Amino acid sequence: LGTPPADMIKHIHDEGRGVAALCGSPSQARKHADAGVDIIIAQGGEAGGHCGEVGSIVLWPQVVKEVAPVPVLGAGGIGRGRQMAAAMALGAQGVWCGSVWLTTAEAETHPVVKEKMLAATSADTLRSRSLTGKPARMLRSSWTDEWAREDTPDPLGMPLQPILTAQAQFRINRAAERHPGAEKLVNYFVGQVVGTMNTTKTSRQVVYDMVEEFIEAVERLAAQLED
């Protein structure tokens, strides 16, 4: 959604805090770095919400090279330790996770949406402008299907599209638990990693499992070098 304004970055730095910003391309990353952003979050097209078109495995090393030595976090498709290991093998100094928290026990995700996510595969998401006016990855639903029809007007740009759809979304979410029509319409932002989010876990267990799998992946690769 753009580079943070200079006055905002200065204010945060004056408070002794760091600034991080998302990017979907090397050129966006360069703008962030030149503006004084401390951490670049390179988010691939697999990610939920607003995202670019370039896949994570291609994007991460490009951004790392573009902004070095500014630290980069890999994002987009991160929900397992092996994916974390892949990001760090490609030069990232850590990872940024979003979607994986939406089905945790602590998440305040709409109950119907959470059930949809738990049942979804990685093919059940798409990039749509139907909620915000900008391309954003979300669950496919009757809502996205209707907006994609050839006889439907194109979504308005941001911020007009959210103004247009906010009341409808509010009513859909309120009715989704008791009305099958609303249940088909309800959706939310989520990345392709949703296909691995098939059970409800605590946030603690998500972190624990990710770290354990990361260690196993790194040790397996190290063992191959020893052989």
Show which residues each predicted segment covers:
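Conserved active-site-proximal phosphate/metal-binding subdomains
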Residues: 58-73, 79-227
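Alpha/beta enzyme core
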Residues: 1-73, 80-99
